[in-house]
């Protein structure tokens, strides 16, 4: 309608990486000569590898709500833009919410992080460890290997340890499996909360009504904006 972005035609080049960091780097190297405007890796692991390359090449990386959290320091990471939120924000917001839910104190509570065993999934761990020391809750991190279809041992561990709350940094099929496994062990769904990549409708559909009460963080606008009306 507008002849492109500000009147400039933009061609979108896609690469199938299978969430594989090496393939993502290969994609970057093979396409950067096309006159790249910006790259969106959609992978924290790829983002870490591409930051020095893109910085040297003068090409921006847009990692919206993912990637290297410390890249929000623009004085150091001049070519990386990770607004509007990052994983440290997400961990902090989740803990603040849980603190409010527990009457203003997390002292002595047990909070478990179920995370995708990748650079992405590990991003919130230092923040949660620091917040555990600050607020007095017991923190444990449990890894789930990609793609996440096998989680029985992790959820048996959760059933044994009975944490007060479970946070999830999941991805793809891992989310569906985790929510179903939580239902299988009768974990209180109202005490289970995911990051924004674990909050799609398809994540809760397989568990049906058993997923009622599950929550997820969100940074996307949910009300009507003029630009959304124009797109419609």
Give residue spans per PLM region:
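Signal peptide-proximal N-terminal region
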Residues: 1-12, 104-106, 133-136
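Beta-alpha junction/loop-to-helix N-cap segments that form part of ligand/metal-binding clefts
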Residues: 3-73, 83, 144-151, 176
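A short acidic, amphipathic alpha-helical/loop segment
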Residues: 26-27, 49-53, 127, 154, ...
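Periplasmic-binding protein-like
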Residues: 31-44, 62-65, 110-115, 162-172, ...
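A short helix->loop->beta-strand "cap" motif at the edges of active sites that frequently abuts
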Residues: 57-59, 137, 187-191
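Ligand-binding "clamshell"
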Residues: 57-59, 74-80, 205-212
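Extracellular/periplasmic Venus flytrap/periplasmic-binding protein
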Residues: 69-70, 78-185, 224-230
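Extracellular/periplasmic periplasmic-binding protein-like sensory domains
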Residues: 182-232
């Amino acid at each position: 309608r507008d002849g492109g972005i500000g009147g400039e035609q933009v061609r979108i080049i896609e690469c199938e990486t299978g969430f594989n960091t090496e393939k993502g780097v290969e994609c970057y190297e093979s396409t950067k000569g096309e006159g790249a405007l910006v790259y969106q890796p959609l992978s924290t692991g790829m983002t870490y590898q591409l930051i020095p390359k893109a910085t040297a090449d003068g090409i921006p990386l847009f990692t919206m709500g993912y990637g290297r959290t410390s890249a929000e320091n623009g004085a150091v990471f001049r070519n990386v833009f990770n607004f509007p939120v990052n994983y440290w924000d997400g961990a902090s917001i989740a803990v603040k919410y849980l603190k409010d839910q527990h009457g203003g104190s997390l002292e002595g509570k047990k909070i478990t992080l179920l995370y995708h065993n990748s650079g992405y999934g590990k991003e919130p761990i230092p923040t949660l460890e620091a917040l555990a020391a600050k607020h007095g809750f017991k923190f444990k991190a449990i890894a789930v290997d990609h793609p996440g279809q096998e989680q029985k041992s992790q959820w048996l561990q959760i059933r044994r340890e009975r944490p007060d709350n479970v946070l999830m940094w999941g991805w793809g099929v891992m989310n569906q499996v985790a929510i179903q496994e939580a239902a299988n062990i009768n974990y209180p769904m109202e005490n289970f909360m995911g990051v924004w990549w674990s909050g799609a409708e398809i994540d809760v559909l397989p568990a049906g009504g058993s997923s009622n009460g599950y929550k997820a963080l969100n940074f996307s606008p949910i009300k009507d904006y003029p630009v959304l009306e124009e797109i419609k």
